[in-house]
């Protein structure tokens, strides 16, 4: 199972993710309590080996903003959480994760328009896009409509429910942020336990 740890701001947290086998590490550039600058992400990325993909999280960025971050960090993947058009995703010089909020179990009508992107299902936004710590209604989602090897599950995951999420959706990856935090800060021990748990499913 591919595991993405998102919203990292400190070198100690990056170290915990790297040492415990994270496959993707996410930096949030959109407005958020976890927001970092390109320069901060660049410094943190120096401690990430090339086999771990660096992901930048954005909400309705301009193409110049995307390009600056892709080159400046540098990023392997951009994660788009707004109303970005398919054309922007197709033109981006990086892999793309397109995030969709799942409201009342309904998948957005345009979810399959992003044919070249990974599809991330998340809980509906609150003050900021993503990272709310809440799950969407798993029971109402027909994941058979989605391509499994492009599917990423996020939204309220933690060590207690990640096994059920993986068994239910059979996703390509799982994505966590607040579920590995204590009092709003990343917790290296929780990062370790979550990665071990997620990667242990089915073994």
From Swiss-Prot:
One Pfam entry name: PRAI
GO MF annotations, alphabetized: phosphoribosylanthranilate isomerase activity
EC top class named in words: isomerase
Reactions accelerated catalytically: N-(5-phospho-beta-D-ribosyl)anthranilate = 1-(2-carboxyphenylamino)-1-deoxy-D-ribulose 5-phosphate
Lineage: superkingdom: Bacteria
Record-linked InterPro entries: Aldolase_TIM, PRAI_dom, RibuloseP-bd_barrel, TrpF_fam
Enzyme Commission number, as recorded: 5.3.1.24
Gene Ontology biological process terms from the UniProt entry: L-tryptophan biosynthetic process
Ranges that cross the membrane: none
Pathway: Amino-acid biosynthesis; L-tryptophan biosynthesis; L-tryptophan from chorismate: step 3/5
Entry keywords, A to Z: Amino-acid biosynthesis, Aromatic amino acid biosynthesis, Isomerase, Tryptophan biosynthesis
The keyword Kinase is assigned to this record: no
Family: Belongs to the TrpF family.
NCBIfam families: PRK01222.1-7 (NF002300)
Entry-linked PANTHER family: N-(5'-PHOSPHORIBOSYL)ANTHRANILATE ISOMERASE (PTHR42894:SF1)
Protein name in the entry: N-(5'-phosphoribosyl)anthranilate isomerase
Organism this protein belongs to: Listeria innocua serovar 6a (strain ATCC BAA-680 / CLIP 11262)
């Amino acid at each position: 199972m591919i595991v993405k740890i998102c919203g990292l701001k400190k070198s100690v947290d990056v170290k915990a993710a790297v040492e415990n086998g994270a496959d993707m590490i996410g930096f949030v550039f959109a407005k958020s309590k976890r927001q970092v600058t390109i320069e901060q992400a660049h410094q943190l990325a120096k401690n990430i080996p090339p086999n771990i993909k660096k992901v930048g999280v954005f909400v309705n960025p301009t193409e110049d903003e995307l390009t600056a971050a892709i080159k400046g960090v540098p990023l392997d993947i951009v994660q788009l959480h707004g109303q970005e058009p398919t054309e922007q995703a197709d033109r981006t010089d990086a892999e793309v994760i397109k995030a969709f909020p799942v409201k009342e179990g309904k998948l957005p009508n345009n979810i399959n328009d992003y044919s070249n992107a990974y599809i991330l299902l998340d809980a509906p936004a609150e003050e900021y896009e993503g990272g709310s710590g809440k799950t969407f209604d798993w029971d109402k989602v027909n994941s058979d409509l989605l391509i499994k090897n492009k599917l990423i599950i996020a939204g309220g995951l933690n060590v207690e429910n990640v096994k059920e999420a993986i068994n239910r959706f059979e996703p390509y990856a799982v994505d966590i942020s607040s579920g590995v935090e204590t009092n709003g800060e990343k917790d290296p021990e929780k990062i370790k336990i979550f990665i071990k748990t997620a990667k242990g499913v089915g073994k």
